Structure formats: C-alpha cells, structure tokens
C-alpha cells in the first residue's frame, strides 16, 4: 500500500514552507507566482489571494504528486520517517531532482546512512549556501534517520542496545552498518579506545563518555 505523509511530516513541511495568502515571487526572475504553502504554477496570478482553508487544500493536493513520486522512485523498504523526509525534500527541490539524485541511488542500494548524508548537498541556491536550506536539510536528514540510526542517550552494551543505536555506533566507527553488534563492531570499539589511550575493554560496552567522543 502506498504511503502518505504523516501529521509530523506535514508539520515539518509547513514550518519551512510557511503560509502566505497573497501571491508573491521570491525572486523577480521566477516564472510563476507562489501562494499558500509553497504552491507555484500557472494557476497563481499576480494579486491573487486565498483563505487558509484554500491553502490547506492546495497543500493536500500538491502532496499527492510528491508522495506518488517518492513511492514510485524508492524501490526498497523505508520507514515512515524516511518517507516524510523524502516528501519534504521533493516538495522543496522537485520530484525530478530526487529521481536523478545520488541520494536515491544510495537509498535504493539500502545504504540508508549514506543516503541521509546526501541531504546536506542540497543547501544551495544559485551556487550559494542558504542558511534556511541548510537548516531544512539538517531537519530532513535527522527525520530520515530517526528510529533507524539513533545516537544512544545512555550507556549501551551488546545485550541492551537497540538496533538503531548499534547502527549509529557503526556509522561513527566507520564499519559496516547492519545493526548487529558483532566481532567487527567490537574490534572497532577496541581500536578506537586504544587510539584514545583509554583502558582496554571487551568492545561490547559503550559508555556515555565514549559516545560523546564518537559524536565530535
């Protein structure tokens, strides 16, 4: 069954799009006027005004196209958070951008964390970094990873860590990301501790202090 954007996903999109009830052009060179929650097209005329209810209806209708694109382009399993992040990204950048992106290529190879890192490459306009886009991409990336690759907030061990915590550790340690705390992950932890000059351990426990070091 095709996914649709969750309430949380829509809230994120609305936060960054904002809502304007009178038609405008962000740049004089833009072909079309924009109105509502970033709705743009030949149907938006100069001087046009709408109600909030109409803006909501436009958003709902526009979302269908981007949801369809994400559902069609992504060929592997994904979480609702991943879907929501991709819809927000597509709504802002365009569905065709996602289709030809390295982000999608990595995602369709199940390289989820590598795919997430691609969000930050789309923070420019006219070749210049835009702070608002940087913030939006960071929020989309965080949403994409939420529940799949999460930074531990407490000390974790092989027997207590959730798979999402293990993936985060593996990502930061630069080892294969599979969510399984096996020998290679333990060896990477031991190697990192040795490099830091810390006491030896089994490699199957990570303290908060160690987690903070990995997050730098």
Task: Specify the residue positions occupied by each region the protein language model found.
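Cell-envelope/ECM-targeting effectors and their regulatory/trafficking segments
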Residues: 110-113, 117, 131, 135-216
């Amino acid at each position: 069954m095709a996914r649709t954007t969750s309430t949380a996903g829509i809230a994120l999109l609305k936060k960054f799009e904002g809502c304007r009830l009178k038609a405008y052009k962000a740049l004089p060179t833009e072909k079309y006027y924009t109105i509502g929650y970033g709705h743009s097209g030949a149907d938006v005329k100069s001087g046009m005004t709408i109600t909030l209810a109409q803006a909501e209806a436009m958003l709902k209708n526009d979302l269908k196209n981007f949801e369809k694109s994400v559902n069609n382009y992504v060929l592997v399993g994904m979480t609702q958070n991943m879907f929501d992040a991709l819809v927000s990204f597509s709504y802002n950048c365009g569905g065709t951008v996602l289709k030809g992106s390295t982000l999608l290529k990595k995602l369709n190879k199940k390289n989820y964390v590598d795919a997430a890192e691609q969000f930050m490459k789309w923070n420019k306009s006219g070749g210049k970094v835009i702070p608002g886009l940087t913030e939006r991409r960071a929020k989309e990336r965080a949403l994409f990873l939420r529940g799949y690759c999460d930074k531990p907030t407490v000390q974790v061990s092989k027997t207590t860590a959730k798979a999402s915590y293990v993936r985060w550790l593996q990502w930061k340690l630069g080892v294969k990301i599979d969510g399984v705390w096996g020998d290679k992950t333990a060896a990477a932890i031991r190697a990192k501790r040795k490099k830091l000059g810390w006491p030896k351990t089994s490699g199957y426990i990570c303290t908060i202090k160690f987690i903070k070091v990995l997050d730098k």
